[in-house]
Regions:
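Conserved RNase H-like, two-metal-ion catalytic cores of nucleic-acid enzymes
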Residues: 1-96, 174, 190
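Glycine-rich, acidic and aromatic/proline-enriched surface loops and short helix-turn segments
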Residues: 99
């Protein structure tokens, strides 16, 4: 299962890293209030998965107005079977919509060969993910206009995006099975099968 170590928030002018593994009560409370506020508009990549992950850590994600993962699908993009990892999809989308040559995004940050993400010093790790978050921000803007051109925007805003919240909540809640109801159904079908045999 994925582990939530922190959140990076990016605006047009700056970025903020929140370390959720060592967060004060005041900051946790402020973040919880912000992330759950539907009036605070957010761009979230993979909204359904992020909502489920944040909920596991006690946060409710609301207020997302853009999800480039969904909007790219609405515009006809389907990730290749061998390019479904998060970083790979970001690279492919950036090449398709932002004309950034396909390469590891760390190459935009590091002058030499990039180290493993698990070996990166803290500062360089943040630089890498800040770059990725800015790419996501720009993808959301471009794909919004693309959906507008394809007359997909209303469907996206009124149906598809709200549906991600429903699907996330359903997947996390799971399915409850009632033994009593199953037994009743079994008895009903068995009775009907017996009646059908007698009438045959």
């Amino acid at each position: 299962n994925p582990v939530l170590r922190g959140i990076i928030l990016t605006s047009k002018e700056s970025s903020l890293w929140i370390n959720l593994t060592n967060i004060s009560e005041d900051l946790a409370s402020a973040f919880a209030e912000w992330v759950s506020d539907p009036q605070m508009r957010k761009i979230v990549m993979d909204l359904k998965n992020q909502r489920k992950l944040l909920r596991e850590y006690g946060y409710k994600l609301d207020g997302a107005i853009e999800d480039p993962s969904l909007s790219s699908y609405m515009c006809g993009y389907i990730a290749a079977a061998n390019r479904r990892l998060f970083a790979e999809r970001i690279e492919d989308l950036a090449e398709k919509y932002l004309w950034i040559p396909q390469q590891e995004f760390s190459a935009l940050v590091f002058p030499e060969e990039a180290p493993s993400l698990f070996e990166m010093p803290g500062e360089e790790n943040l630089r890498y993910f800040t770059q990725v978050s800015r790419v996501i921000h720009e993808l959301a803007r471009i794909l919004h206009f693309e959906m507008q051109e394809q007359c997909q925007l209303k469907i996206y805003e009124d149906i598809e995006l709200p549906l991600l919240y429903v699907l996330a909540d359903m997947e996390q809640a799971g399915i409850a099975v009632s033994d009593t109801l199953l037994n009743e159904l079994n008895d009903t079908f068995s009775s009907r099968a017996s009646m059908a045999e007698e009438q045959a």
